[in-house]
UniProtKB/Swiss-Prot annotation:
Any one GO BP annotation for this protein: mRNA catabolic process
Cofactor: Mg(2+)
Protein species of origin: Xylella fastidiosa (strain Temecula1 / ATCC 700964)
Residues involved in Mg(2+) binding: D487, D493
Occurrences of domain S1 motif (ranges): 623-691
Subunit text: Component of the RNA degradosome, which is a multiprotein complex involved in RNA processing and mRNA degradation.
Stated role: Involved in mRNA degradation. Catalyzes the phosphorolysis of single-stranded polyribonucleotides processively in the 3'- to 5'-direction.
SMART domains (UniProt xref): KH (SM00322), S1 (SM00316)
Family: Belongs to the polyribonucleotide nucleotidyltransferase family.
Boundaries of every KH domain copy: 554-613
Listed name of the protein: Polyribonucleotide nucleotidyltransferase
Subcellular location(s) per record: Cytoplasm
Keywords carried by this UniProt record: Cytoplasm, Magnesium, Metal-binding, Nucleotidyltransferase, RNA-binding, Transferase
Gene Ontology CC, one term: cytosol
Length: 700
């Protein structure tokens, strides 16, 4: 295939799509250029599915090459290693809108690799990667119901900004990524500075409208490349098997979905499934059916049973109305030795969230393509297998845990104090101890409580809620505070976090087309009502940050010195600063601008360290009397240390009003004496006098 190039203007940026020259053995390959940011995105699809494959094996890997920013990796091996948190999050961002566009029965392995090969510091790789993945999939000749478009939306001074630069985002009240097809929004990911629901919805609609040009260009590229349509044919539906299943099941699935307890409901459905397999086992070989086919159709009947009951009765699995939030219990200060903690329980979803305060040096140093930077607010989400009553892998966080942690972090970020206002590194850890839907939003609620319990001066409490949707034709219901089954069997997972004043984070994943603006508006308004209810329940336990930090949290004292005096505080080979930290038991961080932060659980120790630093950095004042220690005896006088690192000379003539023949007759090393500063010359040399002090005392 000859090289094909398409170029278009996208916001302030020029975007170019190229195919046919690089990675020609891949099923589909596109080079995407957005100004100076360049990515190679490839797709490879297996010709057939593996034997017994019962899920769609789609893998997405996004990687930023360090050479893209003109840097060599800082790791020991000097090469790219395991995916960073940012790479994992962007991989998920690519995956989420494209996964629903593959047929349910398609089980061939598909791998997408997006490599950032040149990076303009002002243009991130996320939107080009999503555009490239959409184009490469469209060129791959596989059953993909795309293409999709993607856009980033900012908001400032009442105006939406299409694909803002990194600099513009720093001033923006909103960072929202939206992806979708020509007719439908499929995915939204955002963080916001407590904006209204109307502004958030407007951003989604604005982004979807603007991305249409991306979809049109990809369609044009695919047409010019003469991409052959997929010859994959879905397996025919086995009507005889479905009839047999329905007959054996009867009303038992419907009865199981009336059981309110999650584990009991799961066991009841499993019992029905086991009985069905046992009853139909003898017919599988005779009828030419297979077990995988039977299980698939059983899952389809589960799906239909729950959805039909919900649409017909407007009553949910656990007996709630559509808008009702599950019962909430809230506790704070549940762990005695930590700096702040909260236990948040909503129905069968529960999180223990802990806040730890540290100094600036505890911040995480990120070695990124654009350079090193430090992160001083860390949020970690853990989802152990026991939280859903299962055995499983425990330890290294999976992609889902990283994604949920980032969403929860976005939820509280808008209310966090700046480093100047609260100079601590803050780590929040959410331990999910039970899960039946919406654990990331439980983490938002729990983190708000733990932060306030730790005394972090957040601007307002934050709560989060997950919304769902079930839609069949023109009939639909919007669900507040969804269960795990409602998420799994529904058409939308719509998470909203915020305060009583506005939205701080929004994440939306939609599995179907036909979600209208009106449905999204209803979901946002219903979410607001639920969020305000949850905030009211949280306020009963703790409505504002505690006035005092935990007894076990470090106290920070901040002082400012002239940058030229930093070397005096550090001392030769670090001797001075090491002595202060060792003798006072404090931790001291010195910044290049002269800011010194002293950390200690003991207030008195911190104050002593501060006093000693102030002594070292204070200027010697002529005419002032100091108490000093004789450091060295010379023939012509004695050197006396009046401040740390500051010695002055007491000439033999200034030791006493009487004649002194030998200095050693009057002074010895280690003697503590009172001296008056006579002069500090231009070279910083200090002249001292003991005699002047004696004369001054005598005159009084």
């Amino acid at each position: 295939m000859a090289k094909i190039t398409k170029t278009f203007q996208y916001g302030k940026h020029t975007v170019t799509l190229e195919t046919g020259e690089v990675a020609r053995q891949a099923s589909g390959a596109v080079i995407v250029k957005m100004d100076d940011t360049v990515l190679l995105v490839t797709v490879v699809a297996a010709k057939t599915a593996r034997e017994g494959q019962d899920f769609f094996p789609l893998t997405v890997d996004y990687q930023e090459k360090f050479y893209a920013g003109g840097r060599i990796p800082g790791s020991f091996f000097k090469r790219e290693g395991r995916a960073t948190e940012k790479e994992t999050l962007i991989s998920r961002l690519i995956d989420r809108p494209i996964r629903p566009l593959f047929p349910e029965d398609y089980k061939n392995e598909v791998q997408i690799i997006a490599m950032v090969m040149s990076l303009d510091p002002e243009i991130d790789g996320d939107i080009p990667a999503m555009i490239g993945a959409s184009a490469a999939l469209s060129l791959a000749g596989i059953p993909f119901k795309g293409p999709i478009g993607a856009a980033k939306v900012g908001y400032n001074d009442g105006q939406y900004i299409l694909n803002p630069t990194v600099s513009e985002l720093k001033k923006s009240q909103l960072e929202l990524v939206v992806a979708g097809t020509a007719n439908a929004v499929l995915m939204v990911e955002s963080e916001a500075a407590l904006l209204s629901e109307e502004v958030m919805l407007g951003a989604v609609i604005f982004g979807h409208r603007e991305m249409q040009k991306v979809i049109q260009v990809i369609d044009s590229l695919t047409a010019e490349a003469c991409t052959q349509p997929s010859d994959w044919v879905p397996p025919a539906k086995n009507d005889a098997l479905v009839i047999a299943l329905k007959k054996v099941i009867g009303g038992r699935l419907s009865d199981a979905f009336h059981i309110r307890d999650k584990l009991q409901r799961r066991d009841a459905i499993a019992a029905v499934k086991d009985d069905v397999i046992q009853q139909l086992a003898g017919r599988l070989e005779v009828e030419g059916w297979n077990l995988a086919e039977l299980l698939k159709e059983f899952g389809e009947l589960e799906y239909r049973t729950m959805r039909d009951a919900l649409l017909d009765t407007k009553v949910r699995i656990d007996g709630r109305s559509l808008e009702a939030v599950r019962p909430i219990t809230v506790k704070v200060g549940v762990l005695p030795r930590v700096h702040g903690s909260g236990l948040f329980t909503r129905g069968e979803t529960q999180a223990i969230v802990v806040t730890t305060l540290g100094t600036a040096r505890d911040g995480q140093v990120i070695d990124a393509v654009t350079g090193e930077y430090k992160e001083n607010f860390l949020f970690h989400y853990n989802f152990p297998p026991y939280s859903v009553g299962e055995c499983g892998r425990f330890g290294v966080p999976k992609r889902r845990e990283i994604g949920h942690g980032r969403l929860a972090r976005r939820g509280v970020l808008a209310v966090m104090p700046s480093l100047d206002e609260f100079p601590y590194t803050i780590r929040v850890v959410s331990e999910i101890t039970e899960s039946n839907g919406s654990s990331s939003m439980a983490s938002v609620c729990g983190s708000s409580l733990a932060l306030m319990d730790a005394g972090v001066p957040v601007k307002a409490p934050v709560a989060g809620i997950a919304m769902g949707l079930v839609k069949e034709g023109e009939r639909f219901v919007v669900l507040s505070d969804i269960l795990g089954d409602e998420d799994h069997l529904g058409d939308m997972d719509f998470k909203v976090a915020g305060t009583s004043e506005g939205v701080s984070a929004l994440q939306m994943d939609i599995k179907i087309e036909g979600i209208t603006e009106e449905i999204m508006r209803q979901a946002l308004q219903q979410a607001k009502v639920g969020r305000l209810h949850i905030l009211g329940e949280m306020d009963k336990a703790l409505a504002a940050p505690r006035a005092e930090l935990s007894d076990y949290a470090p106290r920070l004292l901040t002082i400012k010195i002239h940058p030229d005096k930093i070397r005096d505080v550090i001392g030769k080979g670090g001797s001075t600063i090491q002595a202060i930290t060792k003798e006072t038991g404090t931790q001291i961080d010195i910044q290049d601008d002269g800011t010194i932060v002293i950390a200690s659980v003991n207030n008195a120790a911190a104050r002593e360290a501060k006093r000693r630093i102030e002594q070292i950095t204070s200027d010697v004042e002529p005419g002032r009397i100091y108490e000093g220690k004789v450091a060295k005896i010379m023939d012509f006088g004695a050197f006396v240390t009046i401040l740390p690192g500051k010695d002055g000379l007491v000439h033999v003539s200034q030791i006493s009003s009487e004649r002194v023949e030998r200095v050693g007759d009057k002074l010895k090393e280690g003697d503590v004496v009172r001296v008056k500063v006579l002069e500090v010359d231009k070279q910083g040399r200090i002249r001292l006098s003991i005699k002047a002090v004696e004369e001054e005392v005598a005159s009084i």
